[in-house]
Amino acid sequence: MLRLSGVKSAVRARAAAGAAFSVSLSGPQAVSLLALPLVRHATKRAGGGKTNLKDSIGRRLGVKATEGTYVQPSDIIYRQRGTKFYPGENTWIGRDHTIYAKEPGYVRFYYDPFHPTRRFVGVGLTPEARLPTDHMAPRARRFGRNVISDPKRAEAELAWRPNKEQQLLEEISERRAVKQAEEQALTDKLAAKLKELGFDNSELAARAQKMAHYRTLGWTNAEAARFADAFLNTSSDVKDFDAKFEVTKFGTVVPKSSPETVEKELNETRDKLTKVRQPNAFISLSQIAKIDKILDATVYLSQSQKEQLADEFKVTASLLEAVQPHEEVVKAAKKGKGKLVKVYNVQRKGIDYVLAPKDAHFSEDIAFQKEFVH
């Protein structure tokens, strides 16, 4: 264990002299410390000793900037111990209770009607400013700008932008130009379709373009029409527009839906789905994708009708209906005609075998599937 001999008194003596010091420790091994310069950081205030003659030097407290004096930011206005004065407008207080300026201006000593027992020190931004400002008055602000009388210089100042902001503005303008070109192309396409349906009106084309935008967001045709009218603030041929055609979620114009058009599309969709798959015990992922694609391409069918068709054509029958003799199933599986699926038959409490297509999709990817027959 190392033992320190007179280190405390030596450190105090060297610290009082304000010089670097070095200390040697005596013990089993000699340990030398590097010369360390003492740097003293003032925090709040220097503490006084208790055994002196009470005649130490003063701390130079009091007013440093009188009423009406012009000060710069961080200039000390008042040094104190405790809060004889409180920081007011455009001033702040330090950890040693020193009040200093935060803005360039003129010193004002004042009372605040909301705090009648406190004395405040603030900074007025102009020589005519008096504190405190009215409670409901707008806050005085200094922008650090002067009026430019030269028109050319004023125009150049208005056009000036930082480099980062200028690059960002260029990118935004490019994206805006591309978007405007796409919107114009869509408007022309919709105008051509409207002309085929007997409507030759540029305002209707612009309205249809706005409706197409809202429809891509998932809104209904009625919601898209209402918001498009509010955006364009027009009512020309609105009734005729709503009565003859509507805009789909794909951004195309189609005739107005009716029970006949819905029934016709329902029958056509059912015929397409029948060609893709007949209800049986197996279904593949490719068949599921084709069914979803056909249903998504519909225009007039409601969501409930789409769900009903999906349930009808995606359902799989019980695997027990596809059970074949064990020898034939195993022989076909070995020849690569399909994959072997084991099915548990609850009635006879045994295992049956089913030959499923190679691309068959099961709800659960398991080698052993249980089927419960009631």
From Swiss-Prot:
This is Large ribosomal subunit protein bL27m. The keyword Mitochondrion applies. GO terms for cellular component: mitochondrial large ribosomal subunit. Keywords: Mitochondrion, Ribonucleoprotein, Ribosomal protein, Transit peptide. It comes from Yarrowia lipolytica (strain CLIB 122 / E 150) (Yeast). It is found in: Mitochondrion. Component of the large subunit of mitochondrial ribosome. GO terms for molecular function: structural constituent of ribosome. GO terms for biological process: translation. Belongs to the bacterial ribosomal protein bL27 family. PANTHER family: LARGE RIBOSOMAL SUBUNIT PROTEIN BL27M, RIBOSOMAL PROTEIN L27. Residues 1-41 form a transit peptide. It comes from the Eukaryota.
